[in-house]
């Protein structure tokens, strides 16, 4: 019966759900980074990872953060706290809820309900508008996580921010005879079912992304109902939902009552067996060759449709009472082994790539590849390897060896968290670089503030005396726009940066691979001496953050900046005999001995704000005030910069938590976050030598990645099985 539909009736109005009114617009943030005055917080009142007095746990309301802009006022005289108000009297018995109604959840009061029913919960003044059960359904959360993992494994090339995957049926894109339940995964028929005009369908929430390459979903027949007139398939947006899938143009379906396939026509073609209650029907869309096949109970039924158009939605249709089906878009393992089918097509695509012809006229291709490799080694400062590779391939190194070593010195300082020394060394070797790039300088100094919080910057590591490659004395009052990490002779006034107005620090998706990926176990050296550092800083609000004992550190000598102890390609100290970059020296072993002595204490010092020193905290607060002033001056001279504003706000937010490392913004303290800063500085130095800020090899990788994204947007499904990472061995 479903194979002989009537002529398409006029489009009937589909059932639409009324959208709730939009929430009130959020308050626009004020210009600049403004920290509110801190409330009174007793020592030790904030648990680890909780805000140190900041409202809501995410802002900058902590007392420590406020000190960046407001010096601590003298403590007010102690006064006795007023007694708490007496509790309100219990309500009279007549105001109690009816005994027949369920009690309202905490935070809700019983309000007037429907006639004859129990009262409905109403929000009490001051209570949250969230769900009455604050913890939510943990089982549902776990199911959502499992769905996310399964979809990521099946469709790794899909960017769901750009092209979301279908996850359920759409309550807004269905005919009125369709009912949805169980998180919009179960479909049941609620019409009359007397004629084919009573057919009804529903589409999924999103179309199938081309980046899937191969997409698959399954439908289980819970009940075939009266006649089993059910259709499973695909349809484009706008296709009439008062029809079974397959009856109209750009609609495709496999029907259960007769086993026929319907390809944009009311006349079906014999295709497969019928299906009924208990059967599981799968639909696989191959976006590489634009075909579709079905499965029944895990067995393929062969190709059903060819030459499919792009942007099709999973669709299911019902026609008679009692019909109920459940969809599986990846919420559960599939009956059919779709992953084996995907592996088969991945092999085919990779074989096509391997067979692609490459013209090699007199070794031009090989020579080009060698130049790309050589420039990559030079860009990242692999001196000895670059020299050896150039000799073996009869090439010349474009950059002088001394220049490569200078860049390497600076990169090592940045990757070690010694930002103050990195800024100082950069200014000594490239005097005008940071003047022409004020936003880059700001980025470096924000990173220096983060390293101060982390206790790794030289300003807080060396408290026994003069900082290496740093200023002779730390300013007591804020000196606008001069770097606390630089000697006075190298101080930089922001007005001298006006010539670089509009310049920005250069970031790209490939700059983060400056020296590979840094592991979380980044090597950090600490030395100690017998000199005890103390401070008379009176900041009672920080008592819950700091440990009672002071950090004991030693002065680093000036040759620290020239050390070659660590190869930071992975953030872990490595030694080898590969020339200048990867070499070791006597100083290496001295630093290793120092680390051995501090093995027990260093782990504790790293978990304290500024290494646990009050003097270091005082320096950090002064530095933060100067950083805030520099941000305001940059905004006046160069205009608003949203990235700079967010960067500074995130850095200051670290002080709103008693344990910044385990806070929502604690990822900033991860050594891997030094990589993009290091890459931006390295690229800026290369530009001063008229060298490309990115190596050609990275640009080629970027172009290939962008091409794959363009293929996905153009509906070419083979991009799903041609990732750049497959060829990076």
From Swiss-Prot:
GO CC field: cytoplasm; cytosol; microtubule associated complex; nuclear body; nucleoplasm; nucleus; plasma membrane; ubiquitin ligase complex
Entry comment on modification after translation: Phosphorylated in response to stress. Can be phosphorylated by the cleaved p110 form of CDC2L1 (p110C). Ubiquitinated. Polyubiquitination targets the protein for rapid degradation via the ubiquitin system. Can be deubiquitinated by USP11.
Chain residue ranges for the region called Interaction with FMR1: 615-729
Biased composition (Low complexity): 27-49, 107-126, 473-489
Alphabetized UniProt keyword annotations: Acetylation, Cell membrane, Cytoplasm, Membrane, Nucleus, Phosphoprotein, Ubl conjugation
Region of interest called Interaction with CALB1, as start-end residue ranges on this chain: 401-407
N6-acetyllysine PTM sites in chain numbering: 405
The keyword 4Fe-4S belongs to this UniProt entry's keyword annotation: no
Compositional bias annotation for Pro residues: 1-11, 70-93
SUPFAM superfamilies tied to this protein: Concanavalin A-like lectins/glucanases, Formin homology 2 domain (FH2 domain)
Compositionally skewed regions (Gly residues) per UniProt: 50-60
Main localization category: cytoplasm
Free-text tissue specificity from the UniProt record: Ubiquitously expressed, with highest levels in testes, placenta, heart, and muscle, and lowest levels in lung. Within the brain, expressed predominantly by neurons in the gray matter of cortex, the granular layer of cerebellum and the Purkinje cells.
Superkingdom to which the source organism belongs: Eukaryota
All residue ranges annotated as the LisH domain in the record: 365-397
GO biological process: cytoskeleton organization; microtubule nucleation; negative regulation of ERK1 and ERK2 cascade; positive regulation of amyloid precursor protein catabolic process; protein-containing complex assembly
Positions of modified residues (Phosphoserine): 477, 487
CTLH domain location: 403-460
GO MF, one annotated term: small GTPase binding
Domain B30.2/SPRY residue range list: 147-334
Function: May act as scaffolding protein, and as adapter protein to couple membrane receptors to intracellular signaling pathways. Acts as a mediator of cell spreading and actin cytoskeleton rearrangement. Core component of the CTLH E3 ubiquitin-protein ligase complex that selectively accepts ubiquitin from UBE2H and mediates ubiquitination and subsequent proteasomal degradation of the transcription factor HBP1. May be involved in signaling of ITGB2/LFA-1 and other integrins. Enhances HGF-MET signaling by recruiting Sos and activating the Ras pathway.
Subunit relationships: Part of a complex consisting of RANBP9, MKLN1 and GID8. Identified in the CTLH complex that contains GID4, RANBP9 and/or RANBP10, MKLN1, MAEA, RMND5A (or alternatively its paralog RMND5B), GID8, ARMC8, WDR26 and YPEL5. Within this complex, MAEA, RMND5A (or alternatively its paralog RMND5B), GID8, WDR26, and RANBP9 and/or RANBP10 form the catalytic core, while GID4, MKLN1, ARMC8 and YPEL5 have ancillary roles. Interacts with GTP-bound Ran, AR, CDC2L1/p110C, CALB1, S100A7, USP11, MKLN1, SOS1 or SOS2, GID8, and FMR1. Interacts with the Dyrk kinases HIPK2, DYRK1A, and DYRK1B.
Protein name, per record: Ran-binding protein 9
Species this protein is from: Homo sapiens
Classification lineage: Eukaryota, Metazoa, Chordata, Craniata, Vertebrata
